[in-house]
Amino acid sequence: MDGPTRGHGLRKKRRSRSQRDRERRSRAGLGTGAAGGIGAGRTRAPSLASSSGSDKEDNGKPPSSAPSRPRPPRRKRRESTSAEEDIIDGFAMTSFVTFEALEKDVAVKPQERAEKRQTPLTKKKREALTNGLSFHSKKSRLSHSHHYSSDRENDRNLCQHLGKRKKMPKGLRQLKPGQNSCRDSDSESASGESKGFQRSSSRERLSDSSAPSSLGTGYFCDSDSDQEEKASDASSEKLFNTVLVNKDPELGVGALPEHNQDAGPIVPKISGLERSQEKSQDCCKEPVFEPVVLKDPHPQLPQLPSQAQAEPQLQIPSPGPDLVPRTEAPPQFPPPSTQPAQGPPEAQLQPAPLPQVQQRPPRPQSPSHLLQQTLPPVQSHPSSQSLSQPLSAYNSSSLSLNSLSSRSSTPAKTQPAPPHISHHPSASPFPLSLPNHSPLHSFTPTLQPPAHSHHPNMFAPPTALPPPPPLTSGSLQVPGHPAGSTYSEQDILRQELNTRFLASQSADRGASLGPPPYLRTEFHQHQHQHQHTHQHTHQHTFTPFPHAIPPTAIMPTPAPPMFDKYPTKVDPFYRHSLFHSYPPAVSGIPPMIPPTGPFGSLQGAFQPKTSNPIDVAARPGTVPHTLLQKDPRLTDPFRPMLRKPGKWCAMHVHIAWQIYHHQQKVKKQMQSDPHKLDFGLKPEFLSRPPGPSLFGAIHHPHDLARPSTLFSAAGAAHPTGTPFGPPPHHSNFLNPAAHLEPFNRPSTFTGLAAVGGNAFGGLGNPSVTPNSVFGHKDSPSVQNFSNPHEPWNRLHRTPPSFPTPPPWLKPGELERSASAAAHDRDRDVDKRDSSVSKDDKERESVEKRHPSHPSPAPPVPVSALGHNRSSTDPTTRGHLNTEAREKDKPKEKERDHSGSRKDLTTEEHKAKESHLPERDGHSHEGRAAGEEPKQLSRVPSPYVRTPGVDSTRPNSTSSREAEPRKGEPAYENPKKNAEVKVKEERKEDHDLPTEAPQAHRTSEAPPPSSSASASVHPGPLASMPMTVGVTGIHAMNSIGSLDRTRMVTPFMGLSPIPGGERFPYPSFHWDPMRDPLRDPYRDLDMHRRDPLGRDFLLRNDPLHRLSTPRLYEADRSFRDREPHDYSHHHHHHHHPLAVDPRREHERGGHLDERERLHVLREDYEHPRLHPVHPASLDGHLPHPSLLTPGLPSMHYPRISPTAGHQNGLLNKTPPTAALSAPPPLISTLGGRPGSPRRTTPLSAEIRERPPSHTLKDIEAR
């Protein structure tokens, strides 16, 4: 039996290990340990992942010899790869959080060190041998059966050497006893061997068994095994296999193989959960289970074979032997005496295992469901049979470990964590996982014999979750399985594991969070804070090591406070990396107030600590003393643990802190510089989610500068945007942000140096830095992976920078220009429409503040261009006002009709579009009807201003709106005709006063749809990538063209004509992001030459210098090229406006005057409007992502772009928050953010519309 068992166990364990090794090789690029191991591992890796048992069955016992060969290389991997990988990883080694822990391990005999690296594995295996899937579990169990009574570290050595030798024969058997091997698996998972595999597996299995892996990882986070995110998952895989094995001794033998057959899927799934359960239970149950397995395994193994025969028949022969060796291996109690003594426990175990065996064969049937099935059987049997005792016995520790496990798994293992938490009450899939996990942590030293007594019952459910054993793998398993036989080693191991716990927490948190390895360091910092937050949750996790003997009593009560302190103290270090900006982001001002002490700031926020990063690192060491006052040895490991992660993190953070401290100085200078300050404010807007950030915008940039460094390293990894993490993903919501943000975090990690240096150092822009900190699309992303965006950033940044600061100054100037030019003309309208305009303005603040951005731009052009045109054609303008009003009212009525129909199809899309066109269109209607200059303004804004934009908008408008238009030719055409008439009149104002425009209106009303698409596209599209920009962009253009331009227009410095320019810019915006910048320069010259353009430019120079020139070049070119195109644009504009015929109908009469009033008011309010405008744009969630590519430009013109950024990135999801916060922020930021024109309504409207708008855009197009 031993031979077959060894063959099976070895095979299984070898497979699991070879799988881990294979994964580690893939991850770490390590050469395969051995050809046999590779073969077994590769076969087994797929088989383990897909059907471990089947592979093992297929390979049968022969693989046991083959796996035994690569096994030493795996052990070597564990030794060198684990440590090397850990060191390479940049944070605590897999096994050792600190170099001191590593040195301790190295100080241990090389064997011991290798096994200490395996120790989480070996000890876990011994404590969690019940998991039986771990290689070390088999090794450990063999070692345990032979040397289990002896020192666990000796057992570790034996586990490695003797265990490996015996494991080959006993390996499979011990896989069946994989319940104990669960910890072995955990330990091994923690070890470098499983490290690579588990890193990959943590990603593979993290997704596969997110909840189980979460449990496993969460507990691993607590234990050494979980040090590596990989360890938790690879162990999870094995644990799941083991878990299946753990269910029964018999089941473990037979069901584990069978489980391995189809446990490939289940192994990962149950692995994490079951690992947590089984490891916890195995800590306490292993010996009982193993002895039980010894006695009853044979009887139940036959049953299990009969039940599991269908799947793992080969394994069935070895289950008995496997159980026997395993029983030998786990005996914390003397293997011979404990096994017989545990015969009665096995009797307990057998009833539960038998059902599990019975259930288990079905589980193998459904590998996907195997996890669920296995866990539920584990639940049912553990919950009913073994969970009652273990739960009662482990409930206290389970409660603590529940928090621990749930908190440990909180980062990425929240799912298992709730099951853990509910394990006590609900004993759900992980009922024992936590209780056993707690015992593993808590009872490993003291309660493991009792735990084993419980474990007979608990073994059936030996979801013996030894994720804590990984924590305790070093400290708990040596002391735990020997049941305190080696407390000194236990202390050492505890120190080791404490250090590893931090490492595993940091690494596993990253793993559980699922950040890629490149993010692991970044997440390491961040997750050290985050995990320290979870370490607060995990407090008991640490304490179990200090209180391994009285873990239940001590761990629940003292551990949480101690760990609260310690994680808090350590957290300040890590969190200062992450939260140093995050809490500032939350508190905003406090971090800004103490920006010099990035850690001090946050340390103060998180904990009263010195502002010294190194001090923070030292404090974690000191805090551990307080935390681990009970066990100074543990404190020492914590110190080394903190020392290594602390040193690394502290050094990293310190360097980063120095860097961005220097950057802070630079940023302060930059902040003194309005542009740079604007930039800084904008990042703070990006970090605006923390309200104080708004006020501490300047200071916050410093803090964000730090966070930039820290956030880049830890914050971005931490989605730091934690404030912005979700919104960044919302940024990912669309392409630009999506590709920007996802990499932004990794790039933030890269940006720790690149962005950390660049964002707060190289770029030195608080905006860029906070962007990098918040993984904001612009600077960090741009700098790191968005260098295209970086050019965009610089282009947009630079162009909007000069426009943006003037907009601050220019709101009045623009207003004065508009007032000077349009005031004479608009004063009458203002007086007439004063009340109406105020009402309408209020209404349009909601409605038109969307167009308000275009309106501000058009109002300025209306005033400036209106001066040219109005002075030239005051009669035409008056006529147009009357005629346009008359026609606009019918048009609006018609639009109300057609809009009622079209609104169903196009209203949302149009309402969205019309929100932008509404600005544009309201401006167009009011301006087109009311003012020929507004025609220019309006046409340039959405259509004429940028041929590409116009074509974008016309194409989308004419393409998608042409369909509705043709569907409603009468209504749309009347609208078109009226609008075209007005618009054509305006355009023809210079050429033909009213007759030609009317003719164009009538004759071109339908054509403009196609003509605008065709003629507008040919001209502007030729100059701009509008073919795609029109239709393709308009998919984004409904929100992309519309919102992007609206959003980007302010960013591009088109703020006066945001609505008008907003449409064009999207077409420019995603591709023409650069083009608008280049185009603006080209347009600038042309517009400077162009009187209207120049007047518009002069009036809107600050914001529109870039936007307006290009807008007006497009406008002039468009008008010059195609009067009908202009008309079509107006038609298109009307069509977007047609969405709001009711609004236009309301405004119809007052639209021109009201538009003029709005032009003036928007000139005044546009600065505020623009800040709100981005917020309004944020309402268009799609465009923020579109803005994300445009965000550089948007980002650059910090006023509106900031709002856009914040709304898009930060407040894409919560535009309301952005709207509520950004208006003040933007007003704080820029000269024009002051007015929250139509902030919430617009955002709400646009928010409502953007999805449908995008869909309808796509649909209509």
Swiss-Prot record:
One of its GO terms (molecular function) is chromatin binding. One of its GO terms (biological process) is positive regulation of lamellipodium assembly. Its main location: nucleus. Component of a PRC1-like complex that contains PCGF5, RNF2, CSNK2B, RYBP and AUTS2. Within this complex, interacts directly with PCGF5 and CSNK2B. Interacts with the histone acetyltransferase EP300/p300. Interacts (via Pro-rich region) with PREX1, DOCK1 and ELMO2. The Pro-rich region is important for the interaction with RAC guanine nucleotide exchange factors and the subsequent activation of RAC1, which then promotes lamellipodia formation. This is Autism susceptibility gene 2 protein homolog. Coiled coil: none annotated. Transmembrane segments: none annotated. Disulfide bonds: none annotated. Residues 177-192, 435-446, 868-879 have a biased composition (Polar residues). Residues 800-809 have a biased composition (Pro residues). Pfam families: Auts2. The keyword Acetylation does not apply. InterPro entries: AUTS2 (IPR023246). Keywords: Cell projection, Cytoplasm, Cytoskeleton, Nucleus, Phosphoprotein, Transcription, Transcription regulation. The modification Phosphoserine is found at residues 1200, 1235. Disruption phenotype: Brain-specific gene disruption gives rise to no visible phenotype at birth. Mutant mice have normal weight at birth, but then show decreased weight gain over the next few days, decreased milk uptake, impaired motor skills and impaired ultrasonic vocalization after maternal separation. Residues 1-88, 105-236, 251-486, 505-545, 771-1023, 1121-1148, 1201-1261 are annotated as: Disordered. Residues 105-118, 148-158, 275-298, 812-849, 880-935, 960-993, 1245-1261 have a biased composition (Basic and acidic residues).
